[in-house]
Amino acid sequence: MSPTTAANQAKKLIKVPEMRRIKHIHFVGIGGAGMCGIAEVLANQGYKISGSDINASKTTQQLEENGIKVYIGHEAENIKNANVLVVSTAIDPENPEVKAAIEQRIPIVRRAEMLGELMRYRHGIAVAGTHGKTTTTSLLTTMLAEENLDPTYVIGGLLNSTGVNAALGESRFIVAEADESDASFLYLQPMAAIVTNIDADHMDTYEGSFDKLKDTFVQFLHNLPFYGLAVVCGDDANIREILPRVGRPVITYGFNEDNDIRAIDVERDGMRSHFTVLRKGREPLRLTINQPGLHNVLNALAAIGVATDEGVSDEAISRALKGFSGVGRRFQVQGEFELGEGNVKLVDDYGHHPKEVEATIKAARQSHPDRRLVMLFQPHRYSRTRDCFDDFIEVLSQVDQLLLLEVYPAGEKPIVGADSRTLARSIRLRGQVEPILIDPVEGNLQNIMQNVLQPNDLLLTQGAGNVGAISVELAQHHLYVK
């Protein structure tokens, strides 16, 4: 069989047989990280794709460059001739496009339901967990690619090596993040699943019950077939608690001795980490991951667990980790700029939960031990700020200098006592760091930076809101990055 014939047959495997009646798919909120990737994969399958978003962005521009019609603003006429609407949790039920679809009896499906259809007829691998999903999904995708398995992937961030967050591969594999924030990962029925950790986040979805959140993860793992595989972090106390209830094949990973896959002899080397992985029935394997932090060693172990089970060679695993160039906004180095007799390094990170922020701080200390750590932090959602208030106080007090932006609401209404001013006051009372409130709209960010930053500082922009755009602006227009 010629390579061309094989590729064409592989493409046929990607088709969704039961969606043959669907020609035109419209995405409401197409600029979202989870939405745009699915839209691009479906467009590459030959479906007509359109979408709308409230604001233009780099993402919507890229979608248009790829031939997808994007409307800025939500209007009923945008859905003309659509056969189905795909919506994210963030979309208001009163959205005019949603209301028009209801009136016209056009099916409305959630993002994860459409992802589930993509996964239904393939060898699906879903990566779940409160933290680390994007990096773990990216690592596993890279390992499969190094073995020339050419997976389809849908990732919540830009894979730096490809410049995109989704692509249609020619093999039976599809790797995707499984989102627990709205419990929509229950739509997925993968062949293999990873759970990186379980932590208290998005608790409004689970009526404030952590037990209900854990129950939902058990239900997710039971979406696996009886011959599937769950690869879970055995170091996580909440995962260990639910394991007796999981009636599927399980492999555990972590640093503890009782795990099936373990990392030992970890050495930290600037922006890299070296470790030896132990797997049952295999020789020890010394590896280097081109990312700092113990949390990234755990992410690598998760990917190794699935990759090994899928037949990826040790050589491909090693190449993937050593050459891994990271994911957009995951400890992403933006560059350096001169200040006095030294320089300041600018790093941007998406982490927005206290445990994610703490992991980033540890990675920053590990990779740049001689630099003072200045953090520009933007809390994400009033509800998370309220629910994790004490944890934020403890974690944010670990930096040398803290600059606080106002809470990014993500569609939420303000909650009394869950704003940045109250958070700053509580951090100040703890007495370890003196936070500075910043309103970039007033144009005082640059002035404050000039007064706060010192030669050889590490400036870390942190959060899931528009602080990432501020980081890019600092890099491109103000800080003269080399």
Curated annotation (Swiss-Prot):
EC number from the UniProt entry: 6.3.2.8
GO CC annotation: cytoplasm
Catalytic activity entry: UDP-N-acetyl-alpha-D-muramate + L-alanine + ATP = UDP-N-acetyl-alpha-D-muramoyl-L-alanine + ADP + phosphate + H(+)
Positions that bind ATP: 129-135
Assigned keywords, A-Z: ATP-binding, Cell cycle, Cell division, Cell shape, Cell wall biogenesis/degradation, Cytoplasm, Ligase, Nucleotide-binding, Peptidoglycan synthesis
Cell location: Cytoplasm
Gene3D superfamilies given in the database record: Mur ligase, C-terminal domain, Mur-like, catalytic domain, NAD(P)-binding Rossmann-like Domain
One annotated GO biological process: cell wall organization
Ribonucleoprotein found in the keyword field: no
Pathway where it operates: Cell wall biogenesis; peptidoglycan biosynthesis
GO molecular function, one term: UDP-N-acetylmuramate-L-alanine ligase activity
Main EC class the enzyme belongs to: ligase
The protein's role, per its UniProt record: Cell wall formation.
Family: Belongs to the MurCDEF family.
Name of protein: UDP-N-acetylmuramate--L-alanine ligase
Gene that this polypeptide is encoded by: murC
